[in-house]
Amino acid sequence: MSSVTKRPRAKRIRLPLEIIDTILQYLDPILHAKVVGLTTRVKCRLLRDNNVEDYLKLTPASYHPTTDQFICNYLGITNQPMAPYLVPLLSFGKASCVFFNKCIPEDVRIVTLNWPLPLLENFLSKQFLWYKLARKLIEHERRMDRCVTPSTVQINLYDDNEDYLNCFNCFNCCKDNLVSFNCCIVDCNINDMNRCPDLQIDVYLDDNIISLYLYFLFRIYRIVKE
């Protein structure tokens, strides 16, 4: 009876987590996170892709927004007044505008709405349409010598049937129809408007109500009633 020669078992090589993490960066960031967890590399990938929603979803059960310093460090705003409130604001999603108005101190709101650092403004504008539009309108008002320094903002959005769309606070909602938010705002007298807008937006900067008319893919008209 012939003897069978057994081959020696190959030794299993366990790669360090850092090397695995480096290899996995070529995968989808969500899959990357599910394999190795929310590592620093994964966090940076998600934030580079402006994917805050999945960043928050992938955090462990023990996670609390008020203790997360990573996003502020990533943006370089750790010394800014908004820093302690940024991640809680992001975690509120559709209710972010309400949280901003009611839970953030007035002096912080004023700075964030009127004189934000460019990095912070760019980041918040990508997360929240209400913030993007508020900043665009505030800058327009100043260019037109209408001084505004609001501490609160509320936005009511209507379609051509005057139906209120209450999902405006979420960046992803309605974004396909609001491409024109990237164009400039121009003044227009209400008497010069010859047709109904495709979209009407009432912006409350404190108690000051400003109406905007949108005609898709063209421009935003700031209605002047003088």
Curated annotation (Swiss-Prot):
One of its GO terms (cellular component) is host cell nucleus. One of its GO terms (biological process) is proteasome-mediated ubiquitin-dependent protein catabolic process. The keyword Transcription applies. Residues 9-58 form the F-box domain. It is found in: Host nucleus. Pathway: Protein degradation; proteasomal ubiquitin-dependent pathway. Keywords: Host nucleus, Transcription, Transcription regulation, Ubl conjugation pathway. Interacts with host S-phase kinase-associated protein 1/SKP1. F-box protein that manipulates the host DNA damage response (DRR) in order to promote viral multiplication. Acts as a substrate recognition component of SKP1/Cullin/F-box (SCF) complexes for targeted protein polyubiquitination. This is Late expression factor 7. It comes from Autographa californica nuclear polyhedrosis virus.
